[in-house]
Amino acid sequence: MSTAQRRVQELEKLILHHQDRYYNAESDISDDAFDALWEELARLDPGNPLLKAIGSDSQRDAVKKRHIVPMGSQHKAADEESFSAWAKKNALQAFLVQHKLDGVSLELQYERGHFCCALTRGNGIVGDDVTANVRGMRGFVPTLTAEWGPCGNLPFTGGVRGEVIMHKDIHRSHYPTHANCRNTVNGILKRKDGRGRTHLHIVCYDAVPGTPGKPFTGSLPFADETEKLAWLARQGFVTVHSHRCANAQEVVALRSEIMRTRELLPYSIDGLVVKSTDLDFQDAQLPRPKKQIAFKFSTQEAITTLRDVQWQTSGVTYTPIGITDPVRLAGTTVKRANLCNPNMLTKLCLKIGSHVLISKRGEIIPKIEALVSTPAHAQEIHIPTQCTSCNTVLENSGSRLFCPNVNCPLLSHHRITRWIECLEIKHVGTELIQRLFEEKKVRRIPDLYTLTCEDLIEIEHVGNATAKKILEAIHHKKEIALQTFIAGFGIEGIGETMGEKLICAGFDTLEKVLHATTETLESIYQFGTELAKSVVTGIARVKDDMCELLDRGFVRILAKQQAESPLRGKSFCFSGSLRNGDRATIHRIRALGGVVRTSVTRDLSYLIFESLSQPYRTAQKLKKEQGVALEIISEDEFCRLLDQASASCTHTGETVHPLQGKSFYFSGASRSMNHKHAQEKVRALGGDVASSVTAQLDYLVFYSQSTRYRTACALGIQIISEETLHKLIATAQSPLHTDAHVHAPLHGMSFCFSGDLDGMTRAQAIALVQRLGGTVKTAVSTQLTYLVSNDPHGQSRKCQNAVRCGVRIISEHVFLALCTPGT
C-alpha cells in the first residue's frame, strides 16, 4: 500500500470520528481544521464515497422522520480566489449574501398551516424528531396565516428551514463551561426534559412546499429568494440577515467588512452563504447545490505535516521551530510554526511526520497547537545536547533549553545585536555584525566605539565611503534614555517596557539600578522573584561594559524626566492598526515623558483605538467591572493630546526636533537649494543624510526620476518634493507639531489596483499606500477614491465597475504623483 493510500484511509477514519463528535458530542477540532481534512481527502482521492456522504447528528434511540427535501451540504470557498472562480463558473445575475450561522440545522414541518414536527439534519434524508423541545424556543411559530397558493388564501403545507442558535451573552452567563454556543445548542436539542430550550433561538432562511419525499408540489407565493424571506417574516419567523450584491466584487468587499465587525454580532457566524437570488428547485435538491456556496472567513487554523524541527538561537536560548508542508493560513502560505519550548514537544507527543494543527491568531510565526495523528513511520525529534558555539552541555528545564556558559560567544553576539537594534543604529546589519564578531574586531558592545575605518575596510564589500558611513551612524547616537540603555544589553526579560517599569518604580538612575536587589525588584508590578533574580544577575555580568561606555564618553544617559514633562506619568496603549501608530509616534510620546504599553492593565492611562480589537474589549471590561480610571480615546483625540503636550514643551523651552531619527536621500538636481545646504539643514534639525537608498531610508527627496527614485518606489519609501522638504524644515519653529498631510499625503484616500504595474509589484504599491496613510481595497465600490490601472482601454472588470460607481481611474504615473506631494 502506498503512502497516499495509507493517508486516505487515515483521513477517512479521522473525518468519520470528527463528524460524529461534531454532531453528537463536544467537537475536539475547529471547523477550519475539519475543512482542511476534507480538502486533503478531496485532493488525494476525488472520487471517495465519503465526500458524497453527509454527516449524521442522529441519536440511536430518537424517533426518525423524513425530510421534505434532503438536507445537503454546501461547497466551500476559503479565500477570494476560490470564491471568484465559483462566481465566474456560475455567472449569476446577482448574489444574495446571508450570515452563515454557527448553530444546528432544523426543518420545521407544517400541514395546512399547522406545525407538525421539527427534525434535525440527521443523515440528510431522515432526522431526529425534536418537536417537544422546539415548541419552547424563541422564534417558534405554531400556526401560519393563509398566504399560499395561486390566490394567496391557502394554508401552507411544507417545510421551513432554519438554524437553532444561542446568543453569546446567554452562553457566557448560563453555560460558561461549555466550549461554544453550537455545542451547547446540540446538547440542549437532545435533552428529553427540555431543560434550557428557552435559551435557544430559531432563525429561518428557506421555505419548501410539499410533503416528505415529494418536495416542491403546489404553487409559490414568492418569485425569488428575497420575496421568500419577506414571506417568512410576515409569518412571524425571525429571518437570517441578508444582503443583495450586484457582483462578486461587492460580495468580497462585504465579507471583509463583516469579518471586521462580526464580534459585535449577538450570535456566532463562521462565514457567509452566497446564493443565487433566483429560485431553482432542481439545484436545491442536489447533495451540494451548485448555485450556493459557503464563503468562509479567513482560515485561522489548518492541518499539515511536520517535516523537520530546526533549533533557532536567541542569545543562549534554543527554541524549536517546526518546518511543515506549505498550507494556506489567514491569507498567507505558512511553512514554519513555533513550538515554544521542549516541553511542547513532549506534551504533544510530536514526531517528524506527525499531522499537526497549526494556528495563526495575529502572531507573526504561527504556532503548533495540537497533534492530530502520528503515522507508524514517524521519527523521533532530535533535541540538541551541546551548544553549537562553545560545546557546553545544554540545560533543559522543560520550559527552556539553554547554554549555561556565561561566557558563551552566542551571548556576547546577542548583546551586540541587541544594542544595535535598541539604538536603531543604521547601516550595521546582521551580516556585518557576524563578520566583525567572527574576525574578533567586535566581541563586546564597547568594541563598536573603538572601530576604525581600517578595521571596516578589511571586511569584504566594505569600502572607504561605506566605512565612514557606518562609523558616523554608530557615533551619531550619543544620548540614550535609561530604559533603552538597559534594554540594549540583552538582559533576559528586560526590554524597554520593563525598563520603563523600573524607572516608574523609582530606579530612575543607572546607579540605583546597579545597586538594586532581588528583594526590592520583586515588589515591582509584573516583576516576580525569577525575573528579579534574572535582572540582578544580568546587571552584574554587564556592569563593567556599562561603566566603560559611560566612562569613556561613548554614550551618555539622558537626564531623568523633569516633573513638568507634559506626559510624565501617562501611559498609552494602541489598539488596532492606527494610521499614525508607528515608531515615530512612540518616540514622540517618550520624548514628552510618556510611556508606551503593549497591553491593557489597571494602571494604563489611555487606550487609543481604531477597531474593536482585544485590547479595546479588555479596556472596556476593566472600566465596567473594576472601575478602572482609564480613558479610551480615538486617534484624532490622541493627536490633539500630543499637540497640546508639544505646545507645552514650546512654552517651557524644551525642544524635540521633528526630523530626529529620520533619514533622507537627495535624488537629482535641486531647483532652489543645493544639496550641501539642504543636508546641513536636515542635520541641524536632527535628521540623517543617507548616501544610498536602502530599506531603512525614511524619505527620498525627489528632483528627477533617477534609478534611485525607482529603487525607492520599489522599497516603499516615502518620496517627497523639494517643497515638502521646505515644509518639514519649517516645522522646526514648532517642534513636534507636524503637518499630518506632510507625513501622510494619502490620508483619507482609498486605492484599488487593476492589472500589473510597471515600476513596482502590487505588494510594493500596497505597502507604499499604507505607509503614506492611505488604505487599499480589494474591490471597487462607491466608497473607493481611486482605481489605479495601466490599461489604456479600461477593459478590465474593475475598470468597468469603476465607471459604473463613478470612481476616478488613474494611471501609475498619476498614482506616483499623488504619493509625491508638492510635485
From Swiss-Prot:
It comes from Treponema pallidum (strain Nichols). Transmembrane segments: none annotated. It catalyses: NAD(+) + (deoxyribonucleotide)n-3'-hydroxyl + 5'-phospho-(deoxyribonucleotide)m = (deoxyribonucleotide)n+m + AMP + beta-nicotinamide D-nucleotide. Zn(2+) binds at C387, C390, C403, C408. It holds the Pfam family DNA_ligase_aden. This is DNA ligase. It comes from the Bacteria. SUPFAM superfamilies: BRCT domain, DNA ligase/mRNA capping enzyme, catalytic domain, Nucleic acid-binding proteins, RuvA domain 2-like. One of its GO terms (molecular function) is DNA binding. The active site is at K100. The keyword Transmembrane helix does not apply. NAD(+) binds at D31, D32, A33, F34, D35, S73, Q74, R121, E163, K275, K296. Keywords: DNA damage, DNA repair, DNA replication, Ligase, Magnesium, Manganese, Metal-binding, NAD, Repeat, Zinc. Its cofactor is Mg(2+); Mn(2+). DNA ligase that catalyzes the formation of phosphodiester linkages between 5'-phosphoryl and 3'-hydroxyl groups in double-stranded DNA using NAD as a coenzyme and as the energy source for the reaction. It is essential for DNA replication and repair of damaged DNA. The keyword Repeat applies. One of its GO terms (biological process) is DNA replication. The lineage of its organism: Bacteria, Pseudomonadati, Spirochaetota, Spirochaetia, Spirochaetales. Its EC number is 6.5.1.2. Belongs to the NAD-dependent DNA ligase family. LigA subfamily. Residues 562-655, 654-742, 741-823 form the BRCT domain.
